[in-house]
A protein has these predicted regions:
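C-terminal extensions of enzymes
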Residues: 144-169
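Catalytic core of soluble alpha/beta enzymes
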Residues: 1-113, 117-125, 136, 144-151
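Short helix-capping segments at alpha-helix termini
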Residues: 131-132
């Protein structure tokens, strides 16, 4: 049904409040139960790596992605990456990574880290320009309203018609 496009396993986090230890039986159920979904950030170890041997095309990475170098350090060249601009040290590093991925046909999608205000506008602008049709996790502010109106923007997000810098107006 395409209702689930990405499943985040949180296996790359260590020492945080969102850590999820590797769970081979759960990973196997996810792989089999959601055959079309991307699988984000599995923890790869002796027990779990074999589960993903035939699933490289579905594995996407988020937490470790901060630069071109971190993409190159992945266990295999990915087909998908979750780009969270707030993880990059500079706009230059962000754009170098996007360019690197475009040159290698690595598909991108956008993610956020609870950005509100101007940060949310930035991730919308980037998503609309570089990965508008991807399974983005960058909902417009209106979706966070406790009483949303019926006039919510739909995907894909269109780029701003009169952009100023990275603003979304």
């Amino acid at each position: 049904t395409d209702a689930v496009r990405t499943l985040d396993l949180k296996g790359q986090y260590h020492g945080t409040t969102v850590d999820q230890p590797a769970d081979p039986p759960l990973y196997e159920r996810i792989i089999e139960g959601f055959p079309e979904a991307l699988i984000e950030d599995p923890e790869l170890n002796e027990e779990t790596r074999p589960l993903f041997e035939c699933e490289h095309a579905r594995v996407t990475w988020d937490y470790p992605i901060r630069s071109v170098e971190t993409v190159e350090d992945l266990p295999w060249e990915p087909e998908w990456l979750n780009i969270k601009p707030s993880r990059f040290g500079s706009v230059q590093s962000l754009f170098e990574t996007i360019e690197y991925c475009q040159e290698r046909d690595i598909q991108l999608f956008g993610g956020g880290q609870f950005e509100l205000d101007v940060g949310r506008e930035h991730i919308h602008a980037l998503a609309s320009l570089f990965y508008p049709n991807a399974p983005n996790d960058v909902a417009p502010k209106a979706y966070n309203d406790p009483d949303p109106s019926g006039d919510l923007p739909a995907s894909p997000l269109a780029p701003p018609s009169a952009p100023e810098g990275l603003s979304w107006t």
